[in-house]
Amino acid sequence: MLAVEQWIKIVPGLVYLNGESLFSNAKLEDDTLTFIYRQCINSYPKFFKMDGLSRLGFIATELLLQNADKSHIADNNCATLLFNMGGSINNDYHFQQTIADANNFFPSPSIFVYTLPNIVTGEIAIRHHFYGETASYVLGKWDSKTIIQIVESTFDSDRSIEKCICGWIEYINEQVFEADLFLISRISNCEHTLLTEKTITTIKDFNMEQTILKLKKEIIEVLNLEDMQ
C-alpha cells in the first residue's frame, strides 16, 4: 500500500503543511518564496541562482521534509516525480527575450540551463542527496488518475524505493504559482492516509475559498475598486 505521509501547499501568500498555516498572510505579501527561504533555510546560496520553478520546488521540498520521518529517506530509495502543465514557461519566456532582437542578441547560459522543467527535480536530488528515480511530466491539465498511475508504477518497478516526493508544481510568474507536493511512503498498515485520486485532489483544492478571496482582494486593489461581488 502507498500512503500520504506529509503534504505541502504553496501559493502566493499562503503556505499550508498538513493543513496547518505556517505563516501569517501579512508576512507573505511581497515575495513568498524568498521570505520562506530567509525564515526557514537561509543556508543554500544557490537558491538565488535558480529559476522560479526550481525555487518553488526547492522551498516546497524543504518544508515537506522538515518534520518527516527521514529514517527511510536515503540515497537511492527516494524518488522524485513532479507534474505540471506549463513546463518551464516562465524561464522560456525570459530566455526568449535574450534572443528575440537580432540587434540585441545576448543568449544567457544561466537562463538557458533552466529551460527544462526537469531541472527542478535535479535541484531537489542534489540538495538532499537522492539517487532514486527523478522525472518531470508535462500534462494537459491536473490529472489525478495519471499521477497515481505513474507513482504506483514507479514503486512497482523498483522495490528498493520506500518513499517518493511527488505532486503538482506550476510557476507562471512571481504572482502566479502553485506547489502541491506529497511525501508518499510504502506502508504495511493504515497509519497514514492512503494514496488515492480523491486524497490528492482534496489536498490540491485545500482552502481554495481563502485563496480566491485573496485574489479578489488583489484585483480590487489593482483596479482601485471599493467592492467586488
Identify the function of each model-found stretch:
Residues 1-229:
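Conserved "HGTGT" condensation-loop signature of ketosynthase/thiolase-family condensing enzymes
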